[in-house]
Amino acid sequence: NSVEYALNKMNREVGDRDTLKKFIGPPLTESMEKYYGMSEEEALLGVKYYREYYAVKGIFENSVYEGLAETLEFLKNEGYILAVATSKPEEYAKRIADKFDFAKYFAGIYGATMDGSLIRKADVIRYALDNLGVERENYDQVVMVGDRNNDIYGAKENGIQVIGVLYGYGDLAELQSAGADYIAKM
């Protein structure tokens, strides 16, 4: 809905829902440039409009995958240190985690900056690892879980293993071609 709102404000044809689903995961500017042929300047304006809607309504137009709360609770109780590394702006990610009462499971919630200085998934992952105090020699003890190719690429760029999950927005072909170490489905 947020992308549709932005495109309408820019007098752009929205197209089909399948194209809009591709926006989930990668940085918004990249998706606007790639799928709607926008210039960098137009994409930045699109992000501005996207956030007008998202900050008020879109942020809460989501739902929790079945079994996620139980899985997070189990992993935390088993002693795993859990964190979020998302291309979504950090302040939005924290609000969503609070809404669903998930913040309690995470040692940290890390995301992109609103000013665009931190948006690449690999950089967000590195930012999270640095803030968690994880040294590079211990990256072999870290596993990223993600549902899109940018999650896989970001983990690989940091030298960490990654599990591609099929319950999100990516599909098997996308996760395999990106090089996921493991594939899981719920």
Q: Where do the protein language model's features map onto the residues?
A:
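Metal-dependent phosphoesterase signature
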Residues: 33-70, 78-80
